[in-house]
Amino acid sequence: MDQYEILGALGKGSFGVVSKIKRKEDGRVLVWKEICYENMQEKEKQLLVNEVNILQKLKHQNIVRYYDRIIDKPSSRLYIIMEHCSGGDLSQLIKKCRNERTYMDEEVIWRTLLQILSALQEIHNRKDGVILHRDIKPGNLFLDENKNIKLGDFGLAKILNESLYAHTFVGTPYYMSPEQIHGLKYNERSDVWSVGCLIYEMATLSPPFEATNQAQLTSKIQVGRYNPIPSQYSEHLSKVISLMINVDPKSRPNVNELLGYSFISFKVKERKLNIYYQGLKQMDEDLKIKEKKLSDIERDLQVKEQHLLLREQQINQREKLLLDKENFETQSRINIMNQQLQQQQQNQLQHQISNLSLNCNNSVNSCSSSSNNNTTNSINTQQQIHIQHNTQQQQQQQQTFQPYQIKRTFTTPLPNFK
């Protein structure tokens, strides 16, 4: 129960309250029927269990949708969670028309009839057993936000598993069939009688059979006489009502036979076409909405693209400025390095020139000194040679001629001889 939030009460019955609730996980608005079963008799408890079992089986666009059940044993309460019908019920619509003294449009009546028959076709033709509603009345026919009919309140419904007939006296007297009010066997055609009474009330704004006491009402229902519907309605509507409010259940059509009636069959096809065209119209509207959304998205993308282009231009400009700045700084560093290198080279060159000049001076001095020494040495050598030569001549003069010695003397190289 913590997963639901109570929004407010919608109605109150003999065994509990019907409240509008909101499912917290998704915010969906639903209804729960709170039923206290503590003081119920076994028969009533069985009807309650029966309703839940039937609701679990039914999934149809014209039947109130069942979602879940919660059993609170400490408080002896059962919560049946169902679809919320925001349009109220058919009894409220009839009361409104009665107060305003206006008749319903015939197309509204036909649409209601076709939707009720669609719901009954679902429950009367089930393979796992025919389901009788047994309490069809304006208060049990709900309207959604689009004014579509939803058959609800299956508290008196019965599944015919073993027999084609039921015997129990249940239902609302104004809408009960003759066989049902007399305690005779009845089947799904009894629901058709109730639908006939309901459609009649939509046209005339009052039930076909009214009385001040049960006996009088029973007598009128047994006879089956009622006042004609207002003349503003078609003969087809009057004919269909007379088919449904037929005291002889064997002559009264079932749902499938009613849907096969020519005018109703035509209305069914017309309704299907209307639903189809409404679907196309809705698809067209949805497409227009999607196109508008896509157009808005495209426009937003264009704006974003322009912003991105502008941003890209700004970034490119910044990158260019940064690159120019970086190139300028790099070139400046290169220029400084070149200047430093040139200065270093100049310094080295000057140093080399200075060293070279110093070396040259030293060389000159050395050469000058060496030249003087060489000159002196040369003079001394020449003097020595001259002296030696003279000595040799003297020796030759003193000695006898010896060819070998002469040859030896002349083949010996002379130092620094020029």
UniProtKB/Swiss-Prot annotation:
Superkingdom: Eukaryota
Keywords of this entry: ATP-binding, Coiled coil, Kinase, Nucleotide-binding, Serine/threonine-protein kinase, Transferase
Gene Ontology annotations for the cellular component aspect, listed alphabetically: centrosome; cytoplasm; nucleus; phagocytic vesicle
Enzyme class: transferase
Protein purpose: Involved in centrosome biogenesis. Seems to be required for recruitment of centrosomal material and might be involved in de novo centrosome formation.
Gene3D superfamilies: Phosphorylase Kinase, domain 1, Transferase(Phosphotransferase) domain 1
GO molecular function annotations of the record: ATP binding; protein serine kinase activity; protein serine/threonine kinase activity
Coiled coil region boundaries: 278-363
Catalytic residues as annotated in Swiss-Prot or TrEMBL: D135 (proton acceptor)
Record field: catalytic activity: L-seryl-[protein] + ATP = O-phospho-L-seryl-[protein] + ADP + H(+); L-threonyl-[protein] + ATP = O-phospho-L-threonyl-[protein] + ADP + H(+)
Organism whose genome encodes this protein: Dictyostelium discoideum
Annotated residues for binding of ATP: L10, G11, K12, G13, S14, F15, G16, V17, V18, K33
A GO BP entry: mitotic cell cycle
PANTHER family linked to this entry: CAMK FAMILY PROTEIN KINASE, NIMA-RELATED KINASE 2
InterPro entries for this protein: Kinase-like_dom_sf, NEK_Ser/Thr_kinase_NIMA, Prot_kinase_dom, Ser/Thr_kinase_AS
EC number of the protein: 2.7.11.1
Family: Belongs to the protein kinase superfamily. NEK Ser/Thr protein kinase family. NIMA subfamily.
Domain Protein kinase, chain residue ranges per copy: 4-264
Annotated protein name in UniProt: Probable serine/threonine-protein kinase nek2
